[in-house]
Amino acid sequence: MKVVLLSFTLIIMGTLFSNAQTSKSATQSLSSVKVEAYYFHMSTRCVTCKAVEAEAKKNLESLYGEKVKFQAINLEDDANKAIVEKLKISGQTLLLVKGDTKINLTNEGFMYAVNNPEKFKSIIREKVDGLLKL
Protein backbone atom coordinates (compact mmCIF):
# COMPACT_ATOMS: atom_id res chain seq x y z
CA MET A 1 0.00 0.00 0.00
CA LYS A 2 2.86 2.41 0.86
CA VAL A 3 4.55 1.59 -2.45
CA VAL A 4 1.37 2.42 -4.37
CA LEU A 5 0.89 5.69 -2.47
CA LEU A 6 4.54 6.64 -2.99
CA SER A 7 4.32 5.83 -6.72
CA PHE A 8 1.14 7.87 -7.08
CA THR A 9 2.76 10.85 -5.30
CA LEU A 10 5.83 10.69 -7.55
CA ILE A 11 3.68 10.61 -10.69
CA ILE A 12 1.70 13.66 -9.52
CA MET A 13 4.89 15.54 -8.62
CA GLY A 14 6.45 14.69 -11.99
CA THR A 15 3.41 15.99 -13.84
CA LEU A 16 3.38 19.24 -11.88
CA PHE A 17 7.10 19.77 -12.45
CA SER A 18 6.72 19.12 -16.17
CA ASN A 19 3.88 21.65 -16.47
CA ALA A 20 5.90 24.27 -14.59
CA GLN A 21 8.81 23.85 -17.01
CA THR A 22 6.53 24.15 -20.05
CA SER A 23 4.93 27.30 -18.68
CA LYS A 24 8.34 28.82 -17.93
CA SER A 25 9.66 28.17 -21.45
CA ALA A 26 6.49 29.59 -23.02
CA THR A 27 6.92 32.77 -20.97
CA GLN A 28 10.57 33.04 -22.03
CA SER A 29 9.60 32.62 -25.69
CA LEU A 30 7.05 35.42 -25.48
CA SER A 31 9.47 37.80 -23.78
CA SER A 32 12.11 37.20 -26.46
CA VAL A 33 9.80 38.39 -29.25
CA LYS A 34 11.57 41.18 -31.10
CA VAL A 35 10.26 44.51 -32.22
CA GLU A 36 9.92 44.77 -35.97
CA ALA A 37 10.14 48.06 -37.86
CA TYR A 38 8.74 48.39 -41.35
CA TYR A 39 9.06 51.26 -43.79
CA PHE A 40 6.53 50.80 -46.57
CA HIS A 41 7.23 52.92 -49.65
CA MET A 42 6.43 53.32 -53.33
CA SER A 43 8.93 52.70 -56.14
CA THR A 44 9.36 56.42 -56.84
CA ARG A 45 10.39 58.34 -53.73
CA CYS A 46 11.20 61.93 -52.88
CA VAL A 47 14.17 63.13 -50.82
CA THR A 48 12.12 63.14 -47.61
CA CYS A 49 10.84 59.60 -48.23
CA LYS A 50 14.41 58.38 -48.62
CA ALA A 51 15.50 60.32 -45.52
CA VAL A 52 12.75 58.73 -43.39
CA GLU A 53 14.00 55.27 -44.36
CA ALA A 54 17.68 56.12 -43.90
CA GLU A 55 17.25 57.85 -40.52
CA ALA A 56 14.90 55.20 -39.14
CA LYS A 57 17.24 52.39 -40.18
CA LYS A 58 20.36 54.16 -38.86
CA ASN A 59 18.74 55.02 -35.52
CA LEU A 60 17.25 51.57 -34.95
CA GLU A 61 20.52 49.82 -35.76
CA SER A 62 22.64 52.14 -33.60
CA LEU A 63 20.24 52.10 -30.63
CA TYR A 64 19.07 48.49 -30.64
CA GLY A 65 21.19 46.33 -32.93
CA GLU A 66 19.45 43.00 -33.41
CA LYS A 67 16.68 43.68 -30.87
CA VAL A 68 14.80 45.49 -33.63
CA LYS A 69 14.51 44.12 -37.15
CA PHE A 70 14.17 46.83 -39.84
CA GLN A 71 12.71 46.16 -43.28
CA ALA A 72 12.03 48.54 -46.16
CA ILE A 73 9.14 47.19 -48.21
CA ASN A 74 8.06 48.35 -51.66
CA LEU A 75 4.26 48.60 -51.75
CA GLU A 76 4.24 48.17 -55.53
CA ASP A 77 6.06 44.83 -55.47
CA ASP A 78 3.57 41.93 -55.65
CA ALA A 79 5.95 39.79 -53.56
CA ASN A 80 5.13 42.03 -50.58
CA LYS A 81 1.35 41.76 -50.91
CA ALA A 82 0.95 39.37 -47.94
CA ILE A 83 2.71 41.60 -45.38
CA VAL A 84 0.97 44.71 -46.73
CA GLU A 85 -2.44 43.06 -46.29
CA LYS A 86 -1.56 41.52 -42.92
CA LEU A 87 -0.59 44.90 -41.47
CA LYS A 88 -3.37 46.74 -43.37
CA ILE A 89 -1.03 49.21 -45.07
CA SER A 90 -2.44 51.52 -47.74
CA GLY A 91 0.35 54.03 -48.33
CA GLN A 92 3.79 55.10 -47.22
CA THR A 93 4.11 54.07 -43.59
CA LEU A 94 6.76 53.76 -40.89
CA LEU A 95 5.46 51.15 -38.47
CA LEU A 96 6.79 49.54 -35.27
CA VAL A 97 5.28 46.14 -34.46
CA LYS A 98 5.53 43.81 -31.49
CA GLY A 99 2.95 41.06 -31.45
CA ASP A 100 -0.45 42.69 -31.87
CA THR A 101 0.82 46.13 -30.86
CA LYS A 102 1.51 48.60 -33.68
CA ILE A 103 2.87 52.13 -33.47
CA ASN A 104 2.69 54.33 -36.55
CA LEU A 105 5.61 56.79 -36.77
CA THR A 106 4.91 58.03 -40.30
CA ASN A 107 4.00 61.60 -39.31
CA GLU A 108 6.98 61.93 -36.99
CA GLY A 109 9.28 60.55 -39.67
CA PHE A 110 8.16 63.05 -42.29
CA MET A 111 8.22 65.95 -39.81
CA TYR A 112 11.68 65.33 -38.36
CA ALA A 113 13.86 63.00 -40.47
CA VAL A 114 15.26 65.84 -42.60
CA ASN A 115 14.99 68.96 -40.42
CA ASN A 116 15.43 67.58 -36.90
CA PRO A 117 16.93 64.07 -36.98
CA GLU A 118 17.80 64.17 -33.25
CA LYS A 119 14.14 64.73 -32.38
CA PHE A 120 13.21 61.83 -34.67
CA LYS A 121 15.80 59.64 -32.93
CA SER A 122 14.41 60.49 -29.48
CA ILE A 123 10.87 59.64 -30.61
CA ILE A 124 12.06 56.31 -32.01
CA ARG A 125 13.87 55.58 -28.73
CA GLU A 126 10.80 56.42 -26.63
CA LYS A 127 8.44 54.27 -28.71
CA VAL A 128 10.74 51.26 -29.08
CA ASP A 129 11.66 51.31 -25.38
CA GLY A 130 7.95 51.17 -24.60
CA LEU A 131 7.47 48.18 -26.89
CA LEU A 132 10.47 46.33 -25.46
CA LYS A 133 8.93 46.60 -21.99
CA LEU A 134 5.77 44.81 -23.15
Predicted regions span which residues?
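Thiol-based oxidoreductase modules, predominantly thioredoxin-like and allied folds used
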Residues: 65-80
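Solvent-exposed, acidic/flexible segments
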Residues: 42-49, 53, 87, 113-121
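Local sequence-structure signature of Cys/Sec-based thiol-disulfide redox active-site neighborhoods
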Residues: 29-62
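Structural micro-motif
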Residues: 84-98
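Loop/turn elements at helix/coil->beta-strand transitions in domains of secreted/extracellular proteins
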Residues: 34-35, 65-69, 90-92
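Non-catalytic, surface beta->alpha helical segment in thiol-disulfide oxidoreductase systems
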Residues: 96-134
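Bacterial Sec-dependent N-terminal signal peptides
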Residues: 1-26
